[in-house]
Amino acid sequence: MKQEPTTYQPQEIEKKIYEICSHRGYFEINGNEKIQEKNKRFCLMMPPPNVTGILHIGHALTLSLQDILARYKRMDGYKTLYQPGLDHAGIATQNVVEKQLLNQGIKKEDLGREEFIKKVWEWKEKSGGAILEQMKHLGVSAAFSRTRFTMDKGLQRAVKLAFLKWYEKGLIVQDNYMVNWCTKDGALSDIEVEYEERKGALYYIRYYLENQKDYLVVATTRPETLFGDSALMVNPNDERYKHLVGQKVILPLINRTIPIIADEHVEMEFGTGCVKVTPGHDFNDYEVGKRHHLETIKIFDEKGILNAHCGEFENLERLKARDKVVERLKENALLEKIEEHTHQVGHCYRCHNVVEPYVSKQWFVKPEIAQSSIEKIQQGLARFYPSNWINHYNAWMRELRPWCISRQLFWGHQIPVFTCENNHQFVSLDTPLNCPTCKSEKLEQDKDVLDTWFSSGLWAFSTLGWGQEKSDLFNESDLKDFYPNTTLITGFDILFFWVARMLFCSESLLGELPFKDIYLHALVRDEKGEKMSKSKGNVIDPLEMIEKYGADSLRFTLANLCATGRDIKLSTTHLENNKNFANKIFNAVSYLKLKQESFKDKERLNEYQTPLGRYAKSRLNLVTKEVRNALDNYRFNDATTLLYRFLWGEFCDWFIEFSKVENEAIDELGSVLKEALKLLHPFMPFISEFLYHKLSNTDLENTCSIMIMPYPKEIAQDEKLEHEFEVIKDCIVSLRRLKIMLETPPIVLKEASVGLREAIENTERLQTYAQKLARLEKVSVITYKPLKSVSDVGEFCQTYANLENLDLSPLIARLKKQLEKLEKEKLKLNLHNENFVKNAPKSVLEKAKESLKTLLEKESKIKQELDLLEQP
C-alpha cells in the first residue's frame, strides 16, 4: 500500500492535473458549457511572445494574472476565450536563423529571399514556439487549440487588408523622411530606439570664413558628420553673430562653402551659440533644412560606410571614422578644444547598435489615424488600471509622429505594394497577374516587410477571423462574440509599442476600441529592487522556481506582490513562504481526513447547523464578497492577501482549533474548506484541485474538475454569530497572554475569569472554548474586578487571574532579576557620564536617549506588576 505523503509534493500532481484538464477541453471556449450563463462573455488576448522566446519572469507575471482572471470568469459562468499565440518577431527571428546559417558558412543574400524564408519556416516548425510548452508548466489555461501566429495565412490576409484600407484612405504613404536607422537591422520606429546616457565629448571645430582669416567655432558631439553640413546656424537675436548672417564659411577638410543662416531654433547658451546644420543626419536639422531650403546630403550608406562626400575618409565605417577625422582636424589646426560631455545616445532595441538619423524612402502611417481612438479614450470608453497610466498615454499621443512601418528584412509581412514597368503603383491582397492601370505583366513587389508591431497591432481582432476568407480556420465567426475584447493585461513597458497601436488600429478598422479595461502591471525586479540581468547574476528563472516550489507558489507569489503601480521585488523567501502556505492547507485537509473520510459540497449558509460550521461559512462568505470585488477591480494582491488570511489565519489557526472542542462541526468545516478551495482555484489551480478531490474522496480521473464548477457566490452572513466568535477568540488570546505573564515554575494558572465589555448571548460556549483552548480548568464570566488580581486587556474583554491562592515568590524573584538586568543596561548607555553626554555625536546621543526611554517604560511596567504581587 502506497504511503500518503506528509507534505504537499507539487511535482507529483501538477503535470497530471494539467494534462487531464487540457485533454478534456476545459480550456476551450465551451469547456465550461454546463455552467455558462446567457449573454456572459469574456475575452482576454495573450500578448503574443516572440516565437524565439523562452519563458522569463516577466512572462510569468503577465500569464499568471491573465490566467487568474480567465479561470475566475470561466468558473463564474462566462463563455471565455483566453486567446494564445506567437509573434513572428521579424528582426529577432531573422537574426537567429541568419546566425545558424552563418555557422554553416551560408549568407542569407546568397540564398535569396524565398529560400531564406523557407529556412525560417523550417526553424519555426522545429524550434519555434517552445515558450508555449513552457507556459503549460505554469498552469496557463489558454485555448491552445486556437493558437495563432502572426504569419498565419489568415493573419497575413488581415494584415494586407488593413494596409489596403489605410492606403486607400491616404493614411499610409511612402516618402523620403528622416528615420531612425540601424546599420544592421534597418529602419526603426521612434519607440524601438533605447536611449542611454553616455560619457562622450564636445569637439570645438573651426569653420573659417571665406576671407580665411576669421573663423567661427562650432561645438558638436559628432565631428564625422561635418561632411554632410549644409550651413552654420546662429540665433537671429545673438549680437555676437548678427553681422555674419548671409556670409559663407569653408567646410573643414574638404573646402566646400556653406552659408551662415539665422534661426530661433538655436540655443545661444549651448556651446558657442553657433551650430552646424546637417539635414541628412539629424532630426532637428532635417526640419531646419526644409525651412531654409538647404541641401540634404547623405554621407554614408545603409551599412554606415562613408561615401564620396567624405573625401579621403570614403569607405570608413561611420564610428571608426570619428577618431581619424579628429586627428586630421588637429593636424590642420582646425580643432579648438575637446571637452567631456555626457549625453543621450540612441541604440537599437534589438542589437544595441548605435542608431543614426538617416533620410530614407520608407512607408509611414500618418498620426491622424489615432485621432478617433484618442477622443474615445478621453470619453472614458476604455479604462486604465492603475488610472494614472492614462496621463502617460495622453502625453505620448500628443507627440505622435509618423510611424515608420517598413523594415529592410526578408522575414515578415512583405509590403503588398506592386509597381509595374510603367511606374504605376498599387496595393493588392493577392499576387496580381497584371497592372490594373496599364495591364503590364512586368510587376515587382516592394522588397521591404512591415514592422512586427503592425501585425501585432491587429491582434485583438485578426485572431478572431477579421478579414479572412471562408476557407480559413477562423473567418470572423468569433468577432460578434468576442470583439471588443473584455480586458487587456500586459506590462507597462509595451504601452506604446503595442497597447496604443492596438487602440488606434482597432478603432480605425472596426470603429470601436478593442477592449474595455487595460491593466498595466509593473516590472519584476530582484529583492533589492534592481533590474534582473545575467551579468548581475540575479535572474530568477520561472521554470526553475516551478520545479523547486511548484507553479501554485510562483503564481500566488507574483499576484500577491503585484501591488498597484509598484515594481515587484521578488525573492525566493516569498516563494518559500507561499510553498509553506500550500503545505499549511494540505495539513488542514490531512487533519480533517483523519476525522472523516469524505465531505459534501454545501454552498448555502442555511445548510450549516453547528455554531462553528455557521461561523466558518459566514466568514467565508465575507471573504468571497471581498475576493470577488478585488478581482473585478484587478486588485490581485488584495485578493491573495484575503485568501491567505482566511485560509491560514482563520481556518487553520482557529477553525481547526475550535473543532477540537466542537467535534461535531468537522463535517461542516470540510464543506467550508471545499468552497474555499474553489475560491482559491484561479490563483493556485493545482493544489486546490488536488485537495478538493481529497476532501470529496474522489479522483479527477473519474470526476469533474473544480475549474468548471461555479465560483462561490453567496455573501449572506450571520453577523451576530461572527461577533460572538470574535469575542471568544479575543478572550482566548487574552487568557493566553495572562498565563505567559504569570506562569513561572512551579506556578500553574488553573482558573481565570473574564469580564466582557458587552454581553453575548451564549457565555457557556465562551467558557467551554476558553477552558479548552487556553488550557484552564475553569473560566468564569464576571461583571466585577477581583480585589487581588492581575489582568490583561483585549479588544472585547478584560481577563483576570486571582492571586490570593498562588505562591507568587518565584514570579516575584523573576521580575526582580529583570529589574536588575534593566539597571545594568541603563548604565551601559553612559548617560550618567557627563563627559560622554558632552562629547558624544548627536546621533549617538539621540539613540542612547531613545534606548533609555524604552528601558524606563519596561522598568515602570515591571514595578507596577511587583507592587501588585507584593501587596498584602
Q: Where does each model-flagged region fall?
A:
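Conserved phosphate-binding loops in nucleotide/dinucleotide-binding enzymes
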Residues: 196, 277-280, 319, 356, ...
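Catalytic adenosine-cofactor/nucleotide-binding cores of aminoacyl-tRNA synthetases and other
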Residues: 347-351, 524-528, 532-609, 699-702, ...
